[in-house]
Amino acid sequence: MKRAYRAKTKKMRAAAKTAALVSLGIPLAAVPAIAQDDEGELTPVVITGSNIPTVELEGPSPIVRIDREEINRSGAETVGELLRRLPQNNQGSYDEKFQNSFAPGTSGVSLRGMGMSYTLILVDGRRLGNHSMAQNMTTSFSSLNDIPMAVVERVEVLLDGASAIYGSDAIAGVVNIITRDNFEGLEINASYSNTTDDDMGTQRYSITGGTTGENGNAWVTVDYMQRNSVQMDDRDFSASANQTGAGGYDFRSSSGNPGSIKILPGSENGYESGFYQVPTGSTGTPTAEEIIGAPGINRFDYNPWMTLTPEYERYGASSRVNYTLTDYATAFVHTTYRNLKVHQEMAPTPAFGDLNTDTWGILPASNAFNPFGEDTTFRHRLTEVGPRLFDIEDKVFRVIPGVKFDIGDSWQGEAAFLYNKKDTIDFGQNFVSADAFKEALASSDPATAYNIFGAGAGINSPSVLDALRVNTMRRAQSELRMFDVKAAGDVYELPGGTLALAVGAETAQEETSDIGDSLSMANKIVASGGTSNSGSRSRDAGYAELNIPIIGEDNRISGIHSLGVQAAWRVENYS
């Protein structure tokens, strides 16, 4: 395939222009995306934002490029961490540190603050499959944690919308992660990093081996990463939800431990309506008068119970094989397997409600520890049950077999099949059964009744607490199957240069399912819930792109180095 553009590239000069941009500590440079053949001649390559190969250093749209050297200098441990330093990736992007996440353990990109579903993620120019769980229940996105840092050669970020080139997913822009194409030898990497507080140790190991022969080349990478967790109270800025001392707001919860009682208007005992605090240090048997004597709400600082940065373990393997079939065709296979495990914690379950909704925040008059002798409502935190624990495991498999081929002297084609599958299990512990909790609240037997009038541990017996605890399970899966064929080449010589054309077609099928456990789906978990969903869709697309040079090297005029027009057309049909 070297011969395809050889005659023309001899006429072209590469203008070696570079620009260094610095933002938040990461050097960003417009580096050449230019390949050379064995004779040192420039070989056109496809850059992000166009399907037409070129030897130019820049395409028609603004692109930020981060090469391997800059990645190493950045100190970023994941692709998500690397892209988080871009100023263009801002509002609307979440990473694995996001609490209350509907897609825990993931990392996305939101270019220009438009949301993660509007930024298209590519790996070597082809789509990365969507994560198996939607963020905020509706936002489909691709997780950068599916991509091992060890195989990344460079990252190209297209900062403009590119729907005519890549489809409707590319409204905000495109992130194209380019992996190694050819590697020979053996490379072993090991690193360890930690915070100045010495509490977030991170280990990374990778080994890459590659070989090149007469008929092709191949490489394989095996990598492992482990990072310790950090709790919110390990840092001063996040130690408390009460930020009034720093000029902020008090975000502490109104469901505390000790909790609060709400007396409704028309109390049978003649108490004035309002909130009243269970006394601090209560052993579980305060009188009604002691509670009424402390109006107000006991607040709960949930930050010390929460994970700031979750515990991570990732491992996987990636490989690429390029094999020359004939002088005109080369076959390739790119395979990736990833396993990701995440552990994070949330504050214990809160309980609150009112008499009109039949929820779990109602204390019946029958409760063995109710000193009021009438139904009332309360706000309480079940700290004795313990923090809610989440263990998430992702498994990712991706394979792309394909072939590149020459068509005549100045056209190249490519056809490939992509299969991307992701399985996720989210296992939760220390959740509270709504039915069991309401039963314990209604019990008149001190041995089985739940006591909301204590503070701290040791108020309720282990048997009462064990009867409340339930586990949750959420299983999700996404699959992407796509076939594409494309070609690009020269059409006609114009005074300003060569008129070039790219055409292509693709067909894809996507399937997704996100199924929760029966208790969660029936809203039988206190202060928690969920929905199950599944679906599929197919997409067919065709596109064409034309590069029309108007002014070039042969007809250059004063003040204009080059001038051209790029026209792109794309049609998509979803069903």
What positions do the PLM features span?
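Short strand-turn segments of transmembrane beta-barrel domains in outer membranes
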Residues: 156, 183-211, 300-309
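N-terminal periplasmic accessory domains that precede
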Residues: 79-82, 86, 109-110, 142-145, ...
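Extracytoplasmic beta-strand/coil segments of soluble accessory domains associated
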Residues: 55, 84-127
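N-terminal Sec signal peptide and the immediately downstream disordered periplasmic leader
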Residues: 1-85, 147, 206, 210, ...
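Hydrophobic, lipid-facing positions within transmembrane beta-strands of outer-membrane proteins
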Residues: 107, 173, 184, 203-207, ...
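Short acidic/polar hinge/loop motifs at secondary-structure boundaries
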Residues: 126-159
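Non-catalytic regulatory/gating segments with a bias toward low-complexity or hydrophobic composition
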Residues: 63, 71, 83, 155-156, ...
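Surface-exposed, low-complexity loop segments enriched in small/polar and acidic residues
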Residues: 136, 228-230, 234, 240-245, ...
